[in-house]
């Protein structure tokens, strides 16, 4: 469960290491974001020669949460931390690689590229 001011790790090779959620997209009163939701983030920590710089604002999709996601069969998929993948204005991933596992819930028309780049889909 991600809300404003939440810190997330970045699970791609854009050069960003840490981001902070500044807005949960999808309605004026929307408070929390889960796996597969799009949020606005500010880059808080970045590699020196990365594709993104500290302080820049991007869209991102949440790919892992410590809260987890409940499946239809009753199982719960949780992770050790929260992670996101940075997106451009067309909601396509900026990076060319994804690090760590992602969940099956991302298998929608919008994020198939992320699922295909991920090393493991849970």
UniProtKB/Swiss-Prot annotation:
The keyword RNA-binding applies. Keywords: Ribonucleoprotein, Ribosomal protein, RNA-binding, rRNA-binding. GO terms for biological process: translation. PROSITE patterns: RIBOSOMAL_L14. It comes from the Bacteria. One of its GO terms (molecular function) is structural constituent of ribosome. GO terms for cellular component: cytosolic large ribosomal subunit. InterPro entries: Ribosomal_uL14 (IPR000218), Ribosomal_uL14_bac-type (IPR005745), Ribosomal_uL14_CS (IPR019972), Ribosomal_uL14_sf (IPR036853). Part of the 50S ribosomal subunit. Forms a cluster with proteins L3 and L19. In the 70S ribosome, L14 and L19 interact and together make contacts with the 16S rRNA in bridges B5 and B8. NCBIfam families: rplN_bact (TIGR01067). Belongs to the universal ribosomal protein uL14 family. HAMAP family: Ribosomal_uL14. PANTHER family: 50S/60S RIBOSOMAL PROTEIN L14/L23, LARGE RIBOSOMAL SUBUNIT PROTEIN UL14M. Binds to 23S rRNA. Forms part of two intersubunit bridges in the 70S ribosome. This is Large ribosomal subunit protein uL14. It comes from Methylibium petroleiphilum (strain ATCC BAA-1232 / LMG 22953 / PM1). The lineage of its organism: Bacteria, Pseudomonadati, Pseudomonadota, Betaproteobacteria, Burkholderiales.
